[in-house]
Amino acid sequence: MRDTGKVLQLLRKKNKSRGYIVQRRLQLAQIGHKPFDIRIIAQRKKGVSSRWSVTGSYAKVAKQGYLVTNVASRTIPVPQALKLAQIGNRSLLARAERIALQAAKRLGERYPTLRQVGFDIGIDRNQRIWIIEGNYQPDLRPFRLLKDPSMLRKIVWYKHH
């Protein structure tokens, strides 16, 4: 649906008096005409004063015809995704990681027992970085699809320390 007025009318009809949030559509960078986003895991060890670290990341490529990556066709390492999309290099990943760490730090100040957040990060066609959402219990299964198991081992280690 492209008509914003019709979308709002439909939401009002379906939700009646309940509130709702409409998320802005991002023109995500693409690989082979399929949008992708990045999952970045930020964790810290036990103890409120522990520093946040990025312990893993991967890219989720949407299935053909989908605008969102919830239905991913494949999971690949982020450097490979950036290369295939021809939008940047490791410095773009470093920027996304810094943003995820800043967000995790702020969330940790508000929720002192929080030790893990999985951020879905979008990169648009102009290399702007967007936090799509953060998950306190991110799905770690996609890390098993990567050839290198070191990130998953690191994530699991942080969960137990």
Predicted regions and their residues:
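Glycine-rich loops and low-complexity Gly/Arg-rich segments
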Residues: K45-R51, G65-N70, V78-A85, F143-D148, ...
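Short histidine-centered catalytic/ligand-binding loop motif
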Residues: M1, S73-A94
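N-terminal start-of-chain detector that recognizes signal peptides
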Residues: Q9-N15, R90-R95, A103
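Hydrophobic residue at the +6 position relative to the catalytic HRD Asp in the kinase catalytic loop
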Residues: F119-I121
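Phosphate-binding site of ATP-dependent enzymes
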Residues: M1-T75
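Internal, well-ordered alpha-helical scaffold/interface segments
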Residues: I38, T55, A94, R98-L101
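C-terminal active-site "lid" helix and adjoining low-complexity regulatory extension at the edge
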Residues: S91-A94, R98, K105, R110-L114, ...
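Short solvent-exposed loop/turn micro-motifs enriched in small/polar/acidic residues
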Residues: H33-P35, T113-Q116
